[in-house]
A protein has these predicted regions:
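Bacterial Sec-dependent N-terminal signal peptides
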Residues: 1-26
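N-terminal, active-site-proximal structural segment of metallo-dependent hydrolase catalytic domains
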Residues: 23-94, 102-106, 183-184, 278-281, ...
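Metal-dependent phosphoester-hydrolase catalytic domains
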Residues: 25-27, 82, 123, 134-136, ...
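Coil residues (strongly favoring Ser/Thr
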Residues: 33-34, 48, 154, 210, ...
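Active-site beta-strand/loop signature of hydrolases that rely on acidic residues for catalysis
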Residues: 37-42, 62-85, 111, 142, ...
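Second-shell loop/turn segments in exported
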Residues: 46-53, 71-78, 127-131, 168-177, ...
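Structured beta-strand-rich core segments of catalytic domains in phosphoester-bond hydrolases
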Residues: 73, 79-162
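C-terminal outer-membrane/trafficking sorting elements
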Residues: 304-367
Length: 367
């Protein structure tokens, strides 16, 4: 019987590999030196009638993607089952989360690292524009208070899911007009709030360089031409990257408001192409890929002295090597902790490497 059981176990493993063979590990995007933000439409997440057919596998894969990417803030679209939403939060205890309260099944949500932010409030906005916002998929507004440095700051996030481009030619034109009007109303809402440090995340369901509707300009042209806003995803549109598994356009975007646009690290945005890492990604995870961007923030740990001495004082008597990185993750210098001292004022990430291979990181500000 033991031989039979071993054979059955072998068959189970074999068929498991055939169904969902491993391709590679989802890459880490997050960094200790940057604020890492993303947006992802998780296609009918948890819904038994739509989207991926195996909700358990979808939950597993979505958990893996979020864990491995290690973003600080993530906007989500199409959360469609409260039970699976609760399971996802249980799988990711490092994140706090809020979800919209509108009645549509496909809901928007925001996840944020609890070590970095405290929730101030969340609410749906622009409730007078039900039709424009895909018949009730109102923008989710979330205010988070930063938990780093000597001074607290408030960051605002808006998660949106605009009208999809489906149906006949005339229906697609109608959907285009609804996306354009919804974007206009959201911009009207945000324009007076130039002092707010904010980001708009989500499935915009159209591209930035030109519309996915043949012969039409991007419905977000007024945003793109306004210097008070920057789209980290615009460079991806120009590079002809795509944010879905089935189509060739970028329809998932991130937009940064005036008070935060200078924090975007130029050229540090991208798409996590899911089917490069998860087999049958389109069938068992989502029809969209996560889109991400990196920002330089004031992650200050005030040392209050002219050198980094307090930061390495703890290593006295313990042989180690010190690596010094800038905010973009570039190695600036390395060597003995007592001789490696950045002279320029600024923020640094120090990493101590011990003989046993262990590493410890600390952020310091030199002034």
């Amino acid at each position: 019987m033991a031989g039979l059981k071993d054979f059955q176990k072998f068959l189970g493993l074999l068929f498991g590999l055939i169904a969902f063979p491993a391709i590679g590990q989802v890459p880490k995007i997050g960094s200790d030196t940057t604020l890492d933000v993303g947006t992802w439409n998780v296609e009918w997440f948890g819904d038994s009638l739509n989207g991926p057919s195996n909700e358990v596998t979808q939950l597993k894969n979505v958990t893996e993607v979020i864990n491995n990417m290690d973003l600080d803030v993530l906007g989500l679209c199409e959360i469609s089952n409260p039970g699976y939403w609760a399971k996802l939060q249980g799988n990711l205890p490092q994140y706090g989360a809020v979800i919209t309260t509108y009645t549509q099944t496909q809901k928007t949500a925001l996840m944020y690292k609890k070590s970095m932010f405290r929730l101030l409030y969340s609410k749906s906005i622009l409730l007078a524009f039900d039709y424009e916002f895909a018949s009730g998929r109102f923008p989710l507004e979330v205010a988070l208070e930063s938990q780093w440095g000597s001074k607290k700051d408030t960051l605002y996030f808006w998660v949106i899911h605009l009208k999809a481009n489906t149906g006949s030619t005339s229906e697609k034109l109608t959907s285009y007009n609804r996306r354009e009007k919804a974007a206009e109303e959201l911009k009207n809402y945000l324009d007076p709030k130039k002092s707010w440090k904010g980001m708009v995340l989500g499935d915009w369901n159209d591209d930035l360089d030109a519309s996915i509707v043949s012969g039409k300009a991007s419905p977000f042209l007024t945003w793109r031409s306004d210097t008070n806003y920057v789209f980290p995803s615009y460079r991806l549109s120009l590079a002809k990257q795509k944010s879905t598994a089935s189509y060739s356009e970028m329809i998932d975007h991130m937009c940064v408001t005036a008070s935060l646009k200078d924090n975007f690290l130029s050229n540090q945005s991208g798409v996590m192409v899911g089917d490069s890492y998860i087999a049958s990604y389109r069938l068992n995870t989502s029809d969209h890929y996560p889109v991400w961007a990196k920002f330089s923030m004031d992650f200050k740990v005030w040392v209050g002295v002219e050198s980094l001495e307090p930061a390495w004082r703890e290593t006295m008597g313990i042989p180690c090597q010190l690596l010094v990185f800038d905010l973009q993750g570039r190695l600036l210098m390395q060597g003995d902790p007592e001789t490696v001292k950045p002279a320029a004022t600024g923020m640094y990430l120090l990493q101590y490497v011990y003989p046993n291979g262990a590493r410890k990181s600390v952020k310091v500000y030199v002034r």
